[in-house]
C-alpha cells in the first residue's frame, strides 16, 4: 500500500512539474511574440474629412464596435478589470490622447501594430484586416473629427 501511495505521489508530482514547464514555455513564447517589432509599409489613405466621409466613419465606428472599447467619445475607457489577472484599457483616440497620423491609425486598425512597431495586445485587428482603404480613411476622418477629450485612465497590464 505504501508503495502505491508513493507511486501516485510521484506521478502527480511529475504531472505538476510538466504542467508548470508547459505553461512556462507558452508564457515565454507569448512574451517573445509580443516583443517582436514589425515594420509595415505606409498606405496612402484619401482622408478628405468631408461630412459624408466623417458620417461613414461614424457609422463604421458604431457598427464595427469601436465605441464598445474606446467609448462613445473615443477618449478611451477601462474595458476589462480582472483584478490580479490584469486590466485592459482602450486608448484615447482623440487628439488629446493618441494623436496619431493616418498611417499609424491604419497599422493599428488593420494590423494591430502600435506606433512603436509592437503588437497591440487587445486590438481585434483580425476583425478589420479586410477593411478597405476607403473605410479605414472614413474611420480615421471620424476619429479626427472628434473633439479632444481626456480622462484619467490606468495603464494596461497583464498579471501572471
Positions of PLM-derived features:
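The canonical Cys-X-X-Cys-His
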Residues: 57, 63-72, 105, 139
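N-terminal type II signal-anchor transmembrane helix
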Residues: 2-37
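Long, hydrophobic/aromatic-enriched structural stretches that serve as scaffold segments
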Residues: 92-123
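Residues that flank catalytic or metal-binding motifs in active/ligand-binding sites
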Residues: 62, 89, 119
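N-terminal post-signal-peptidase region of extra-cytosolic proteins
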Residues: 77, 88-95
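Extracytoplasmic/secreted proteins, especially bacterial periplasmic and envelope-associated proteins
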Residues: 52, 56, 92, 104, ...
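Electrostatic cytochrome c docking/interface patches
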Residues: 37-62
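Flexible coil segments in periplasmic/lumen-exposed cytochrome c-class electron-transfer proteins
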Residues: 32-45, 71-86, 114-160
Amino acid at each position: 500500500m505504501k508503495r502505491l501511495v508513493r507511486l501516485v505521489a510521484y506521478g502527480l508530482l511529475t504531472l505538476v512539474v510538466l504542467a508548470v514547464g508547459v505553461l512556462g514555455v507558452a508564457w515565454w513564447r507569448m512574451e517573445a511574440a509580443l516583443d517582436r517589432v514589425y515594420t509595415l509599409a505606409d498606405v496612402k489613405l484619401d482622408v478628405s474629412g468631408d461630412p459624408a466621409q466623417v458620417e461613414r466613419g461614424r457609422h463604421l465606428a458604431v457598427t464595427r464596435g469601436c465605441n464598445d472599447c474606446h467609448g462613445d467619445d473615443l477618449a478611451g475607457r477601462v474595458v476589462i478589470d480582472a483584478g490580479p489577472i490584469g486590466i485592459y484599457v482602450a486608448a484615447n483616440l482623440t487628439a488629446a490622447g493618441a494623436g496619431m497620423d493616418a498611417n499609424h491609425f491604419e497599422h493599428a486598425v488593420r494590423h494591430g501594430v502600435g506606433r512603436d512597431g509592437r503588437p497591440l495586445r487587445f486590438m481585434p485587428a483580425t476583425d478589420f484586416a479586410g477593411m478597405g482603404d476607403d473605410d479605414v480613411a472614413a474611420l480615421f476622418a471620424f476619429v479626427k473629427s472628434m473633439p479632444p477629450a481626456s480622462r484619467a485612465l490606468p495603464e494596461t497590464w497583464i498579471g501572471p
